Swiss-Prot record:
The keyword Coiled coil applies. This is Temporin-HN2. It comes from Odorrana hainanensis (Odor frog). The modification Leucine amide is found at residue 57. The lineage of its organism: Eukaryota, Metazoa, Chordata, Craniata, Vertebrata. Pfam families: FSAP_sig_propep (PF03032). Keywords: Amidation, Amphibian defense peptide, Antibiotic, Antimicrobial, Cleavage on pair of basic residues, Coiled coil, Cytolysis, Fungicide, Hemolysis, Secreted, Signal. Residues 16-44 form a coiled coil.
Amino acid sequence: MFTLKKSLLLLLFLGTINLSLSEQERDAKEERRDEMDVEVEKRNILNTIINLAKKILGK
């Protein structure tokens, strides 16, 4: 009986660690995705400004 309890506690502990690591990995991926979105937005704004300047200058 005691061995069964130890085994169950070990499984619970390992499952908790696995869940925690998965959450950290998911959060890291989400942060990278957010950073890439910001970079894309910056490029889009820059391209829009360049296109407007070309239209204004007539080129």
